């Protein structure tokens, strides 16, 4: 790929942010964001991915308590407890401090709900496209046929458009799984990552949704914006222009950096 099309990425984190064992690795990116990796081979990924472009965060304050069968990581905002086995709800949980729910702030690995009875308070994400959608419904190929979109598939039993999990949750914590995204190479191309490796990011930002999105953008890269020059300007003014006033107008557009 041509150099001008290559992105400036930095997948490596700071060594002092890492807590690592034979088959696990935790990276404390901020006092509220944690990367969790598990690999049976003990091989971990430092290259950027399609989702994660930058892991070079300043190391926050945290403490580690490492025992034979128990690892604890404690920051100002969360407390992780892990028994050093394969990641599962039975082996890893994180307590979010400052209790944002009536049922406490404990998150069991992989859970998207909390409480008893279980409930989901995620504020949801976005749909990749609204093609063939009518309001909140997905419209199928048949007459008035309504189906739910779920990961590219459809479910005729429910017609809601699936927005997926978002980064903000009223329970104070959420996560996203980066295990399947492609690796970004230095030459700008992508390649599949090794199978069987778990790569999950935990976010425990409470109700500070702005801060959560802000740090996610540091991790994933800023939202790409259209350059101003592609937008142009439609100028319609019924005025008796002269050659001189035309020149003045166009020169002002140039001074203001407004495309014409």
Language model features with spans:
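Flexible, glycine/threonine-enriched loop-and-boundary segments that flank and lead into catalytic domains
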Residues: 243-249
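Active-site mouth loops of central-metabolism enzymes
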Residues: 234-242
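Catalytic and substrate-binding clefts that recognize carbohydrates or anionic sugar/phosphate headgroups
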Residues: 65-228, 237-238, 250-255
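Active-site pocket-lining segments that scaffold enzyme catalytic pockets across diverse folds
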Residues: 259
